A protein has these predicted regions:
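Short beta->alpha connector loops
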Residues: 13-16, 69-71, 91-94, 258
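N-terminal Rossmann-like dinucleotide-binding module
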Residues: 1-44
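A secondary-structure boundary/capping signal
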Residues: 12, 66, 91, 110-111, ...
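Internal anion-binding site segments
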Residues: 199-316
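Donor/substrate-binding cores of folate-linked one-carbon enzymes
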Residues: 6, 26-30, 37, 86-211
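N-terminal glycine-/serine-/threonine-rich beta1-alpha1-beta2 phosphate-ribose binding loop
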Residues: 41-83
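Amphipathic, non-transmembrane alpha-helical secondary structure
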Residues: 18, 22-26, 76-80, 97, ...
Length: 316
């Protein structure tokens, strides 16, 4: 039996974290506080936006905190007054020791990789970009470094050739909800956690910047396909389209590989009324779905209805 009497403080912000919090609430755990990021301007209109966790907390009348500074004395005192037994962190930010050291049962984090591999901000994306066939989720006790604490539990998930960052995100989210509940039980039973693993030759998952996401068409087919899959739906692999003397940025979301010998230059565009092909070393990348800045996602057929390529059109 899982002890549901523990007072739990939950910390997180995005949809991934909402699903874990939802699991705690629906399974009748005693969530005494929820900490999420402050409201921030977002999007083209810079409208103030609430985090998904905040929306869920408000809808379920949970005790909500949005500190700008995690070391703020007033906030820390409010947290102490909750007398939490355990804190759970999912997709939040680095915590100061004064925060993670508060509860008697500790503070554990759910991370979307099989630690110690893929420490960092973008483990789901990098696992696909690097061509992994397996990843998973890990729960571990937080310490003063990033994703280095004592491992509690892990669960593996296969990465299928058809997976992209979006589908893998949802798989890991589902498995993550299960492992968080199991981790609470394990901590209550005072079961031994795993020993830390040797850190040599590990793969990392650093934050994705725009330059990480630019497609290099002279890479091999596997690298290009994995990059596009690993960045779909967010933040999106991108390239420049050169056409009729203009240079337009375009996000490539879904493609199909066609292996075939050809004599065209890398990046050249081959098109007819129903397809757009980009030339690569091992054949062609067939575009299926893509997006221009400020426009909705579109398919090739819709795009070609009102667009024409010149003979020298290419992707760079």
């Amino acid at each position: 039996m899982i002890n549901k009497n523990n007072k739990i403080v939950f910390m997180g912000s995005p949809d991934f974290a909402v699903f874990i919090l939802k699991g705690l609430v629906e399974n009748k755990f005693n969530v005494v506080g929820v900490i999420t990021s402050p409201d921030r301007p977002a999007g083209r209109g810079q409208k103030i936006k609430q985090s998904p966790v905040k929306k869920y907390a408000l809808n379920n009348k949970l005790n909500l905190f949005q500190p700008k500074n995690l070391k703020d004395r007033i906030f820390i005192n409010k947290l102490k007054n909750l007398n939490a037994d355990l804190q759970i962190v999912v997709a939040f930010r680095m915590l100061p020791k004064i925060l993670w050291n508060l509860p008697p049962l500790g503070t554990f984090n759910l991370h979307a990789s099989l630690l110690p591999n893929y420490r960092g901000a973008a483990p789901i994306n990098w696992a696909i970009i690097n061509g992994e066939t397996e990843t998973g989720v890990t729960t571990f006790f937080i310490d003063d470094k990033i994703d280095t604490g004592e491992i509690i539990m892990q669960s593996k998930v296969k990465i299928l050739p058809s997976d992209n960052a979006g589908t893998l995100h949802d798989k890991l989210m589902t498995v993550g909800q299960e492992i968080v509940l199991e981790t609470i039980q394990k901590i209550n039973q005072s079961a031994e956690t795993k020993a830390q693993i040797n850190d040599k030759e590990l793969k990392s998952a650093p934050k994705l910047f725009k330059e990480n996401c630019k497609i290099k068409w002279d890479n091999n087919a596997k690298q290009i396909m994995n990059q596009i899959r690993g960045l779909n739906p967010y933040p999106g692999a991108w390239t420049f389209l050169i056409n009729n003397g203009t240079k337009i940025e375009i996000k490539i979301l879904k493609v199909k590989l066609e292996r075939q010998s050809h004599s065209h230059k890398i990046g050249n565009i081959i098109t007819d009324k129903s397809s757009i092909k980009i030339c690569i070393l091992e054949g062609f990348i067939n575009l299926i779905e893509f997006k221009f800045p400020g426009k909705k996602q579109m398919d090739v057929k819709s795009f070609l209805n009102g667009f024409s390529f010149d003979i020298n059109a290419k992707m760079i």
